[in-house]
Amino acid sequence: MLDIKRIKEDPEKVKAGLRAKEVNCDQEVDRILALDKERRDIIFATEQMKAEQNKVSKAIPQLKKAGEDTAPVFQRMGELKSQIAANDETLRTVEAEYRTLMLSLPNLPDEDLKPGGKENNEPLRYFGEPHKFDFPPKHHVDLCTDLGFIDYTRGVKLAGSGFWMYTGLGARLEWALLNYFIDTHLADGYEFILPPHMLEYQCGETAGQFPKFADEVYKIQNPTDDRTHYMLPTAEAALASIYRDEILAEADLPKKFFAYTPCFRREAGSARAEERGMVRGHQFNKVEMFQFTRPEDSDDAFDELVTKAENLVKGLGFHFRTVKLAAGDCSASMARTYDIEIQIPSMQGYKEVSSVSNARDYQARRGNIRFRREATGKPEFLHTLNGSGLATSRIFPAMVEQNQLKDGSVKVPEVLQKYLGGLEVISKK
């Protein structure tokens, strides 16, 4: 949620910032300003009436004592009571529309981002060299099938299209990746979280994914009551709400977390032909990094998360690039995002394996998450940041394809070998 003060101070700048995200919210901004004025006018008028009500109420004993007619006074008291009740009802309606519109506005992009969509994304740096083969490489679907890593047919039989089932050494490779991520984050001093996989609506609202994307996640309706839960599309939705409606001590910041969860996505639309396999599915494993920081520390925290994501990919031996996203390619909740992209040989080009983002105070305002500033004793909204650390659904196919040998076997990355009993190469039985 944006700061209303920021909108009121320079509404045209806010409109321009949102247009840089390729979103035109001019009408919404104008309506928010009108509702804010109407809200303040109603509150002022109600306070005036309550003051008159209090004054009239105090005058009644003196009027009775003097033997004067109190009927007009009681009539006025009744009028004030009715007017206050009507104002309260109007205020509830105004505030409901105001909140709905405020929740609908995307976050403003940082001013150094290029406007527009992905065509204006800016590669910042490259690591390593693109992988080259001296033989015709296989697609990861064929490699995973031949080596018994994944059973696509039975995965579909169990859950339908967009699902797969890890088997044998494939399951162990997947778990090795996750353990590598987890051990690295623990060594960096981050706290491990295993959150619920089903969340309340407010979690999606705080993260900025709801209400806009509420229909794009899986819902579970409790048959015994009216409660609806949502399968988490990413651990960010859970982590962002850990301190919802709380005030933290400044001395306790930053809070550094990571969480492992399966992620569930409906993924509207069908996958493209080149995305066959496990590149795009309805369920995948991911480790998510998250920080709560003071506003003045969030830029350094962002750099830290980017470096952590890069180091995880480096450790696996991949060539990759780090890309600064243009304003319009950042998600609605984020002020800035860097993507870490690797090559999956069968797909050509680069595919994102980690997005690291700074939401500034956008999520904190939506979730009312604050810290108490020691110097002033006053609560302030903190900043939230998140990043994939990492998701496996693209790392796994890239690892299998880039590490394949001419005979159809696959080399195990050195950092994963300890999780597989020292196994260095996996060959077809």
Annotate each PLM feature.
Residues 1-131, 149:
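N-terminal alpha-helical targeting/anchoring segments
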Residues 126-429:
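TRNA-recognition modules of translation machinery and tRNA-sensing kinases, especially anticodon-binding
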